[in-house]
Amino acid sequence: MRRPLSASRVGSTRPTKTARRGDTLHEDALRSMLNDDPNNVRAFQALAAIVSRRAAENGPDGDPLTGALDPSEKQRAADLAVWSLGEELAGNPRAWHPLIELARLSVQDDHEGALRRLAIAAERDPSGEALAEGIAMLRDAGLSSEAIGLGIGHWRPKEQTPEVGRQIVQAALDADRPLEAKQHLRSLDLYPDQAAIADLRAELARAVAQAEQHIAGA
């Protein structure tokens, strides 16, 4: 329910032309950066902050002086603004980070759609960074089984960042599946630079061992 509108505008001020121009120049610069690299996380976050703040501040007609939004409406307006930005950037065939943001926004209301977006993101990024972020996002949402499924379906341990392995092992531990976590840990044997991941493997091995001991003692 929208709060009653006040007829008074005492103390209300519109953004100055200089302020609007500064915002526009910053936004244009960020959009240019994202056009060059649609997976520039810092640029996306900065632009998302601009568009979400603008959406939350403005009334339904885009004029900040015509009405006030309650907190839930502000959040919805901000989320819709970021959603529109993500959709715009996701049209680039090189873009995977915007797809992850879209999945984050939709995972509660459109579970299958979110998983589909994460799968597309993983397919667009041969390095595995998108896959690791997608698995982490699902873990944060409490969807450990879906996180494991995404990882199993797309991980190439010999070619991709070992961070994917970390996320899959942790997802299996989140799901109280230490034996499965151990199997995924073994997949890191395929990574060509074993010296580079020695610390990671030791860290994950300790986590798996602790989980096994916990289950054995239960």
Label for each model-derived stretch:
Residues 14-18, 48, 55, 103, ...:
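Conserved small-residue packing positions in alpha-helical repeats and bundles
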Residues 4-12, 22-24, 39-42, 58-63, ...:
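Generic helix N-cap/helix-start motif at coil->alpha-helix transitions
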Residues 1-20, 30-35, 72, 85-92:
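TPR-adjacent "capping" and linker segments in tetratricopeptide-repeat scaffold/adaptor proteins
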Residues 48-52, 66-69, 73-79, 122-126, ...:
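TPR/TPR-like (Sel1-like) alpha-helical repeat modules
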Residues 3-5, 183-218:
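Terminal, low-structured helical/coil segments at or just beyond the last alpha-helical repeat
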Residues 31-38, 86-91, 108, 119-125, ...:
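Solenoid-like repeat scaffolds
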Residues 20-28, 56-84, 108-120, 142-150, ...:
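Structural signature of tandem alpha-helical TPR/SEL1-like repeats
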